[in-house]
Amino acid sequence: IIRREFTTERMEGTVVIEGYNEIKRMVEEKTLGDKLTITGWYHFPLADPVADDFYNETIDTAKQGDWDLIKIMTCGNYMPVAYGADYEFSTNPEKWDGVFHSHPITCAEDAANLPALDATNPTLAAEVEVDRRIVETYKGKKPVLATLFDPLSWVQELSTPMEPEWTLNLMRTDPEALLKALDALEKTNDAFLD
């Protein structure tokens, strides 16, 4: 709940603004209103591997920033880890991405044989649980938006994160393998959303 002092032609005084209601009002009235809606996001590399730490960092950052909409910036590499990547989390608070020692997709055959994961996958289940806790914390007060990449972005993250050339080459050389991977990742996303 946010308290703001303000004076406008329409009213003056102190009002209590709840992020959810203020954003809803702005959408319905198609106006910005008397206050700018605030949100942001930030990777928490030191908190990513530990669910409680990640939850606390997200809540504390949103509180300090006086955010109206809570953007969950999940561990950037949870999907590769869910698919078995050998990944070492960052120990540098200024560098969100860690070090990959192996990737789940290294060739077209890996892409073609990529399975769909379900919500019982321990990595996906942990992400869902943290998101659930954050949503529960702000339920009815502020909207919460979690990050979920599209399947094509996941292909890149599972093969060569931050370097699109490998994925672009797969599009050109083996589109069938790419389509199979996209289908598996779409099913995984659907299970994750449920």
Predicted regions and their residues:
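Active-site-proximal, glycine-rich beta->alpha crossover segments in alpha/beta enzymes
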Residues: I2-M11, E88-F192
